[in-house]
């Protein structure tokens, strides 16, 4: 049923894209939008991981890396992937002070995971394991394809809505709704389509985040470390550390373990992620059910040693 709902929501995104095409070019524009949407989905299927990793400047790493933090990150991720019955994913690092992580790829055989330098510097080894187990859960559940295709279509809807705003009223009366009516429709689609696309993203992403938290805790064998990690990441992400690439590509925000957007404007009203405290509570309940002690509240400072070898942090 969860997969059925996801496919229905993806169909809704495609319908929104076609609606924007109709306002721009009538029936012809709608058909062109449909063909374009299908082409985007096919392109995303084969190139999703490459596009996202290139966008964020991800660098592939392995066990031979000279930095101990990165070596441990690779070793633990490979070990957990093996224990979860997954092929070895491409393991990458992105140069960002904001602590965060994501997974991408069309299937487990073509999956990639990424952790930011900020995350590796902030968290303990056990907490990093918890985060990467969450990302491996997305791979195991085959969420990565849906999440990347959703990002592609949602981003295209926003771009097409802006195009509709400027050109939607230029058709004549015989061209299916030109003039004032077409302009009003174009204005409405420019305002409402990105919001609708974001709401669909939220519906897809939120349910999958809870499930990835649950499966991730099983993969890591530890719900407490993931709960602490989420608390730390949330605190630091809201402490003034912007993810520049995510701000430029907001349609990819739902791919991260914590919303990477700064919360300016409407971002804080239309979050693509469940509230972190709700996720932590769910993990706490899971820990109690598994016989673990309840996760303690994370400290707002870290004793981890950054990649530079010097201690530091947002408030140091």
UniProtKB/Swiss-Prot annotation:
Stated name of the protein: Protease HtpX homolog
GO cellular component terms listed in the entry, alphabetical order: plasma membrane
Note describing how the cofactor binds: Binds 1 zinc ion per subunit.
InterPro entries, A to Z: HtpX_protease, Pept_M48_protease_HtpX, Peptidase_M48
Annotated transmembrane regions: 16-36, 149-169, 180-200
Gene Ontology molecular-function annotations: metalloendopeptidase activity; zinc ion binding
Annotated GO biological process: proteolysis
Bridged cysteine pairs (disulfide): none
Documented EC number(s): 3.4.24.-
Family matches, as CDD domains: M48B_HtpX_like (cd07336)
Keywords (A to Z) from UniProt: Cell inner membrane, Cell membrane, Hydrolase, Membrane, Metal-binding, Metalloprotease, Protease, Transmembrane, Transmembrane helix, Zinc
Enzyme kind, highest EC tier: hydrolase
Membrane topology annotation: Multi-pass membrane protein
Main location: membrane
Active site: 135
NCBIfam families in alphabetical order: PRK01345.1, PRK03001.1
Cofactor(s) essential for the protein: Zn(2+)
Binding locations of Zn(2+): 134, 138, 209
Biological classification of the source: Bacteria, Pseudomonadati, Pseudomonadota, Alphaproteobacteria, Caulobacterales
Subcellular localization(s) per the UniProt record: Cell inner membrane
Region (Disordered): 295-316
